[in-house]
Amino acid sequence: MEKLVIIGAGGHAKVALDIAILMHNWNEIVFLDDYKTGEIFGYPIIGKINDSHIYKYSHDFFVAIGDNQIRSEIQNHLINEDFSIISLLHPSATISIFSKIERGSIVMAGSIINPNVTIGQGTIINTNSSVDHDCNIGDFVHISPGVAIGGTSSIGSYTWIGLGSNIINNITIGSDCIIGAGSVAVSDINSNVTAVGVPCTPIEKS
């Protein structure tokens, strides 16, 4: 399709718009958002998220909402209703031809995706991040700007890796985790854990 609906109208949506324009795949780009009206950089907000069905057969869709859980709920609903969900890949990103990126994901400027990497649905690979060879990144993950992930590592679904964190090779981080900004993971992290620091250590629950 030559038309694109971006769901969401916040900061993440602004970046998605920029990438979509640079990809030159769509001659019309519009937004749906439940809280904002008007336009973003001259591109109109034309309705609310529930209006998606109006554009189902004429537009591609991208869900540009930073919250992993909300993004997954909206995207999974659209997938179940057979909407056309696309990924956005910045032209300056270096993406191996031997990697796999599932629909609804975004790879931002300056990022590197090396061979035999799998990135799940609805995942954010933010600015200047790197994912080395043989890594598996789950669904609806957020890899923040400047994160470096060593080879043969695994990041579970719904996990958020904070700004500038480093994960050495052969590390498994479970699902639904939060890794604090600037952390260095040198050992595995179980699911449903918040961990911070150098080395990255789970925070004790009070």
What is the predicted function of each stretch?
Residues 3, 27-29, 60, 84-85:
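Residues at the starts of beta-strands that form the adenosine-phosphate
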